[in-house]
Amino acid sequence: MKLTCVVIVAVLFLTAWTLVMADDSNNGLANLFSKSRDEMEDPEAAKLEKNYCQEKWDYCPVPFLGSRYCCDGLFCTLFFCA
């Protein structure tokens, strides 16, 4: 019974992880709400407020947080964006 529960939880976790980390070439989910409210009101100001992102092969401080520090399309692995 315990083993069955552990296996079920592991499968659910890995399925969720795969769906979250999957590369969506069409960016289907990202395009649903791609523009924030501020960006729709003043697109120039929104561009200035964007956070700096790390380019390819740049250092990223926390690899297990994924692509939070890397620019779009890059992923943080082994402390650098690739």
Curated annotation (Swiss-Prot):
Keywords: Calcium channel impairing toxin, Disulfide bond, Ion channel impairing toxin, Knottin, Neurotoxin, Presynaptic neurotoxin, Secreted, Signal, Toxin, Voltage-gated calcium channel impairing toxin. Omega-conotoxins act at presynaptic membranes, they bind and block voltage-gated calcium channels (Cav). One of its GO terms (cellular component) is host cell presynaptic membrane. Its main location: secreted. The presence of a 'disulfide through disulfide knot' structurally defines this protein as a knottin. The cysteine framework is VI/VII (C-C-CC-C-C). This is Omega-conotoxin-like TxO6. InterPro entries: Conotoxin, Conotoxin_omega-typ_CS. Expressed by the venom duct. Belongs to the conotoxin O1 superfamily. One of its GO terms (molecular function) is calcium channel regulator activity. Disulfide bonds join C53-C71, C60-C76, C70-C81. Residues 1-22 form the signal peptide. Residues 23-50 form a propeptide. It holds the Pfam family Conotoxin. It comes from Conus textile (Cloth-of-gold cone). It is found in: Secreted.
